């Protein structure tokens, strides 16, 4: 077995555990409130948007778990970002009304690690 295969299985197992933990919480009856995103979360969202302006529901759910945001906040962020880009004319015709794209959780993790490294360099760690 290759080392990379083990990493993928390990990542999928960890993601499964996070999903089970989130399922147990359920939706509350509290009114929706605006979710404040950290600089790190915003950087990750922007990097993922560069790869997939229309991520699949599963990709958004995985991303939400990985960066500790509610799924609804991630869905709304992508919707708003596409709208901003379309208004500014910066979203190509290929991406307007495009099909949803799935991103492998390992690739998402690599994007997050890349942003983390950039953050560390900027903060002088």
From Swiss-Prot:
Pfam families (alphabetical): Homeodomain
CDD domains attached to this UniProt entry: homeodomain
InterPro entries: HD, Homeodomain-like_sf
A single GO molecular function term of this UniProt record: DNA binding
The keyword DNA-binding is assigned to this record: yes
A GO cellular-component term linked to this record: nucleus
Protein name: Homeobox protein HD-8
Species this chain originates from: Encephalitozoon cuniculi (strain GB-M1) (Microsporidian parasite)
